[in-house]
Amino acid sequence: VFIKNSLKRSYNNGSIGSRFKDCIFYNSYYIRKVLEDSMARQYNHSAVEKKWNKYWKEHPVNVDDGKKEKYYCLDMFPYPSGSGLHVGHWRGYVISDVWSRYKMLKGHYVIHPMGWDAFGLPAENYAIKMGIHPAKSTAENVSNIKKQIDEIAAIYDWDMEVNTTDPNFYKWTQWIFVKMFKEGLAYEKEFPINWCPSCKTGLANEEVVDGVCERCKSPVTKKNLRQWMLKITAYADRLLNDLDKLDWPAKVKKMQADWIGKSYGAEVNFKVEGGEDSILVYTTRPDTLHGATFMVLSPEHTLAAKLATADKKEEVDKYILEASMKSNVNRMQAKEKTGVFTGSYAINPLNNKKVPIWLSDYVLADYGTGAIMCVPAHDERDFEFAKKFGLEIVQVISKDGKSGGELEEAYTEAQGIMINSGEWNGLESSTLKQKAAEYVEEKGFGKKTVNYKLRDWVFSRQRYWGEPIPIVHCPKCGNVAVPEEELPLLLPEVKSYQPTGTGESPLAAIDEWVNTTCPCCGEAAKRETNTMPQWAGSSWYFLRYIDNHNDKELVSKEKADKYLPVDMYIGGVEHAVLHLLYARFYTKFLHDIGVVGFDEPFKTLFNQGMITGKNGIKMSKSMGNVVSPDDLVRDYGCDALRMYELFVGPPELDSEWDDRGIEGVSRFLNRFWNMVMDAKDSKVEPSKEMLRLRHKLVSDIDHRLNDFSLNTVVAGFMEYNNKFIELSRKSGGIDVETLKTFVTLLAPFAPHISEELWQELGGEGSVFNTAWPSYDEETMKEEVMSIPVQVNGKTRAVLEVDVNIDKDELISMAKAELERIGKPVANIVKEIYVPGKIVNIVGK
């Protein structure tokens, strides 16, 4: 256009050449200048993120100066799996980093470490699948995932890094076991355990989900094995009672309480007819003893085979064998009850009636006494069993104290009146429940007692890739702990690390390692060949981060007192009765022996929801629905992905991933960038509206963030960005202080772009060295408000009025406005003003 107009104005053909040359020079300079200015304002996420990642490495923003209050924010550390990270893994890490950066801006020194849960079944199964030694595959996976975690730009302190396979770490895992052994909390026992035929190892009850192995999903069976156990039951009451101390989700606390399963009741002795034996049962309902019409024993009960009469022996033996092949979970969840009559009877001690003794696999050997008295009229399982096998049903509780004839289903109401119960008839069952336990004790055929569902922890595994259990088996001295000064007991190299399936660990084949001398007597002895479970290291790792190079003690008392416990713990709810329960147990034990001064590891717990693929299906390589973050970071930037991870849905709920959603977040970041870059040099003074909007922004974001409503925080940024863009158009810009405030609020969520814009706005150093903005309630109040004016309930006008206007003035303005628009009210009977809400004029 410039050239064309220049030539049109030139009538001197001789000057055309030089004029053309001049205008081309000027125009090219002008276009280049415009393009340079435009490029300078354009947001280039790759360049910005590269620049600030380098800056943070050279100038750490989270430094302990000894003056700041500590805040310990921790992720559940990952298994170093071979598949690496997908967008679902990012979510928890982004949440913890946002919270950590927020706490930094609030003036804390934030402890935010990362490490690797690298021993155990997940790592070993992957190594076997790939045909690589677990030591090599684990190291490779750690290296790969560490690179991926770096892409998140989280402020992890890698100087605190721990790895459960590092001998300098597992020295202390073994040390804890030795201490537990010396305190009588670690012991050896042979009994039927959950056995995974695929993983070829024993499993704790917590590792069996719906009858299958938590890891490989194979059906779980039973196997008699020598096992090491940890007496977690010794801490049952404290684990239950101390849940009240914790700022944890109610769901998790209930799951732990239910798993511990404390109940009050009575133990009652039933004598076997015609013999010296008696059967001890535990019942929570001693008030229903008159209704106990049969007994059921676990197939593993010590009297199970002995009670079989000659004509029932073959049938009983067969049933016991079949039950031994089922896992506890399968037995409990079986829809159809099975059983066999032993041919023997016991005597009900309350009414001296004979009751048949049955075996059934719905009764477990390790709960209560392994035997139950059955009251089919008032228990659904017993009712179903009695109906199937034609056993007597006697109702002893009814709603009104009257018998209603034959029951169609068990009466299981909590309250009722006793019937068919001798001297107890007419009593309220809830009152009798406590008195009945006392009566049983007074009469000498039982006692009041407390029972727990929680079982001792099966701690040993018949696998290679785990911490060696530091115990020596001596024929003379028995089980002897490896001396503490000889720890760590190193995991030896093996040629074959595959599980044997025989009940022996691969370590059993290394004679030169197994054969040793007893630390007590010096005679020939053998090492324990089972290894610890994957939960051993993860039950205490959070203590080691803060003192990970200490070779003299697990953690120094000085550092423990200064930096522990964990203030915020973030991870999935799937660990509610595994890792979280075990970590509480370990912490209480370490408190009891004086290692730490607190007995709960995690003050606050946040469980993030899962990111799923389409139709809510869990992301997995086998499903082909894994979304890698790498391409998204390349195309949209780390900041955009971080914010979309939060924007996709409420952080505590599962959310379905959709790549298209990140485009909206990317547009927001570009619009925000352009707003700041356009306004930064405008030298606009803050108007009342700018100040009001600034303080309202801070208030809204602060409240949403502290409510952990992170998705609405991101929505709030978008909402206020639009408001400021509109205000900027009206006012010719936005003042620098308001822009700095917005950038600071955004910084925990999108750290790279925030650092760059902070610098563009003239901020000193890093944005993370400033303080989280504050707000003033008075400043953020509106000066004007919109009041709808109604006539007989229908809106006719809207007035913009001062927030302090009085009723009479507002009513007058409303009438005048109605006159102006031709909607006057002739016969007014009532004038209503709801302050700050509405005016309604009622007329005939």
Give residue spans per PLM region.
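Catalytic alpha/beta core of large soluble enzyme barrels
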Residues: S96, Y109, H301-D400, G405-E406, ...
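Basic, alpha-helical terminal appendages of large translation-related enzymes
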Residues: R9, N13, I24-H59, V63-K70, ...
